[in-house]
Amino acid sequence: MYEGIVQDLIDELGRLPGIGPKSAQRIAFHLLAADPVDVRRLATALTEVKDKVRFCRSCFNVAQSELCRICADPRRDQALICVVEEPKDVVAIERTREFRGRYHVLGGAINPIGGVGPDDLHIRELVARLADGTVTELILATDPNTEGEVTASYLARQIGPMGLRVTRLASGLPMGGDLEWADEVTLGRAFEGRRVVNA
């Protein structure tokens, strides 16, 4: 254990997700040895992100103004909404350059064991967005795990009666993966989500 502010820094760094005590200590000592200009730049970035970044009033993605850049873009297809759990999922989908619609970030997934129910997520706001009839398809892109599946099923039941097309991202085998290492659920989904191959 170190003295005073050094230990305080290690403790604060250790509170970050994925940073254990050893990593926190390494980062703290890296910062102590770093150029003061670099440390100030990091401190400024941390302060500014907390002061200036908010959540989009429409989709709950991260934004620096009332609307995120995606919701503010008139070229995006307003008839398609892709529902994701977290803002990082928006970034992952945007990297593919396959989706030209808009998003809705739930802020998590239904997890009764973790104490997260439907009322803890941005589901009411999603239903309100769908009410004007602009959206024709809702793509459920929650994580392919138990919580994501529960959330997708819940949303499909809630939104199905609205007459929208509700789809779920196909899940299956990763590129470069071996069949022998695939679990039964993944392999089963790969068969269910198979598509025609044109010769």
Swiss-Prot record:
SUPFAM superfamilies found in the cross-reference section: Recombination protein RecR
Domain Toprim stretches: 79-174
Molecular function GO labels: DNA binding; zinc ion binding
SS bond partners: none
InterPro entries linked: DNA_Rcmb_RecR, Hlx-hairpin-Hlx_DNA-bd_motif, Rcmb_RecR, Rcmb_RecR_Znf, TOPRIM_dom, TOPRIM_RecR
Zinc finger (C4-type) in chain: 56-71
The keyword Iron-sulfur is assigned to this record: no
Protein name: Recombination protein RecR
